[in-house]
Amino acid sequence: MSNNALIPQSKLPNLGTTIFTQMSALAQQHNAINLSQGFPDFDGPTYLQERLAYHVAQGANQYAPMTGVQALREAIADKTAELYGHKPDANSEITVTAGATEALYAAITALVRAGDEVICFDPSYDSYAPAVELSGGVVKRVALQPPHFRPDWQAFAALLSDKTRLVILNTPHNPSATVWQKADFAALWQAIAEREIYVLSDEVYEHICFAEEGHASVLAHPLLRERAIAVSSFGKTYHMTGWKVGYCVAPAAISAELRKVHQYLTFAVNTPAQLALADMLRAEPEHYRELPDFYRKRRDLFVNALSKSRLEILPCEGTYFLLADYSAISDLDDVSFCQWLTKEVGVAAIPLSVFCADPFPHRLIRLCFAKQESTLLAAAERLNTL
């Protein structure tokens, strides 16, 4: 390196390569079954692929509108009305983004100012905190305790201050596989009603909810939705994570600020994919309606196949992840255990501690069951040797 080379001072000095990238690379190196990263090993709907090819062939290959293709925004509005009893305005309240992660980043950047405090529920998805920190915000954390990972509303209330700007929630919850209930949203509203606090609701697994009462969305709460951004993901719903198309729903005033950020992050999202997704929403709504049963069968197959293992499987109410307690098997910390599991047993998992800022004393790993049945059975066969 030249003496004239400049080394930038990192804005995120405590971050390196994500654990998901590390574990997937380790799985490939050791020919392990990869249940670490959250993506399917099967393809999405044939009709969706055909519509993508159609729109490419028809020449829909230039920039889409910054806010998203009109047909897709209108289809999202109709779906939202069907599911949650609230129809957002397709022109002013729905924004299509380059995956849910961009929506989350744009929302946080639009709302959080230097010195603002943002409350997260830990364990939490790893993209929240860096986005807050890059905006000069400070993350405050409410710990969710296993095995049920329910919000502690007294602990939440204790964190509220005049500096609190935003609350980030996630339901169905990654990584715990728990879901919020209507009572949780009522408790949240009661806590913040008299304060100027926004809500960012990460609902990318909205269609993978096994709770009897179904998915509870912030959009179904008439008061909270007036100050909330709800984020969703077509990649999760249609098994097409590589397409990176998501969207967010928010009141017009909030959407206007979010769009200011979005236009300078990506400006627009893949045009033919948006058109294909609009067609899919209209032509085959049964896909998202039947998705809970589709994944419930995989969950139950995997749990039953693991019945002979010494892993203790925690309740799974939503998402395509299972948590497993390995306390009966090893005293290793969860990162070391996942490395050992990948190298010696041939199954890759994610340690739960990476989703937490504070030390995590529990021996829990996350396993993804968005896989073919043969993949799940092969993984269970290896895990049953533990």
Name these PLM-found stretches.
Residues 3, 221, 225-296, 300, ...:
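Conserved core segment of the aminotransferase class I/II
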Residues 78, 157-158, 340-349, 355-386:
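PLP-dependent enzyme catalytic core of the Aspartate aminotransferase-like
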Residues 110-132:
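Conserved PLP-anchoring active-site segment centered on the Schiff-base-forming lysine
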Residues 134-140:
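A short helix-loop-beta submotif of the ANL/AMP-binding
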Residues 137, 194-197, 225-226:
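A short helix->loop->beta-strand "cap" motif at the edges of active sites that frequently abuts
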Residues 144-212:
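Active-site phosphate-binding strand-loop segment of PLP-dependent enzymes
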Residues 278, 294-303, 313-326, 360:
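Conserved glycine-rich beta-strand-loop-beta hairpin in the small C-terminal domain of fold type I
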